[in-house]
A protein has these predicted regions:
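Structural preference for alpha-helix termini/caps and helix-kink/transition segments
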Residues: 5-7, 11-193
Length: 193
């Protein structure tokens, strides 16, 4: 832990139940799968924070692709065949999960590009199926599809609420400025920061 040996006497250890209280189990799995291959795991907060970010990106990208409701066989796309080969090569190398995870992230990155550019829906659907099979099925890094979609809807409604609140505050601020109520306009400006 943080470059030191984990021990009770140093007070720098976590039990599994403590770790699961503090960290989402899938994020913890992501962190451990991403640990350097054949080396001791230096478990620290930076490792967890990085895993929260990268796992979140993976799940978000997967969810956005899943929401497209397409269906396609990923084997139709040569780039996914190549990713599969590299993934399996890493796993065949004494379960080098870090190499496998790099392939999962590369597929997610390419899928993100397709989503952002309005790419082929069949290709996006193929990438979704690939990620489901390899990141979800093999590595166990994805929540259930229904949970992913539920969380996306919750996030969208939260974004809408924030957007409506900001618009309301901007309108109030403009009204305060028009009526030369500078104190109220400044107060609203500070709230918007």
């Amino acid at each position: 832990v943080d470059g030191e040996k984990m021990s009770k006497s140093l007070g720098n250890f976590w039990t599994i139940s403590e770790a699961l209280k503090n960290v989402d189990p899938l994020v913890l799995r992501y962190a451990l799968i991403n640990a350097p291959y054949r080396q001791p795991v230096d478990f620290n907060q930076v490792m967890i924070d990085d895993s929260v970010v990268h796992h979140g990106r993976l799940v978000t990208c997967y969810g956005e692709g899943l929401a497209k409701n397409g269906s396609s066989d990923w084997r139709e796309f040569s780039w996914l065949e190549k990713a599969t080969s590299r993934f399996e090569s890493g796993m065949d190398d004494d379960f080098n999960t870090r190499v496998a995870l790099v392939e999962v992230q590369s597929v997610a990155k390419r899928m993100r590009g397709l989503l952002d550019s309005g790419g082929e829906s069949e290709e996006i659907a193929g990438a979704v199926c690939w990620i489901s099979e390899y990141a979800g099925g093999v590595l166990g890094l994805l929540p259930e599809d229904a949970e992913v979609l539920r969380n996306m809807k919750r996030q969208e409604s939260a974004k809408d609420e924030i957007s409506q609140r900001v618009e309301s505050l901007l309108l109030q601020r403009n009204n305060a400025r028009e009526s030369k109520d500078w104190a109220r306009a400044d107060e609203i400006r500070d709230e918007l920061k």
